[in-house]
Curated annotation (Swiss-Prot):
Gene Ontology BP terms: fibrinolysis; proteolysis
Influence of temperature on activity: Optimum temperature is 40 degrees Celsius. Activity is stable from 30 to 60 degrees Celsius and.
Protein's UniProt name: Alkaline serine protease NJP
Enzyme Commission (EC) number: 3.4.21.-
UniProt lineage: Eukaryota, Metazoa, Spiralia, Lophotrochozoa, Annelida
């Protein structure tokens, strides 16, 4: 795994986690 691939994977997973977090807080 190259650094670029790691960073892009990390960014996409962080974006998905942020969306889940916002959806979770929006439902409460």
């Amino acid at each position: 795994v190259t650094v670029v691939q790691y960073r892009s994977t990390n960014a996409s997973s962080g974006y998905l986690n942020l969306r889940v977090y916002l959806l979770d807080t929006g439902l409460r």
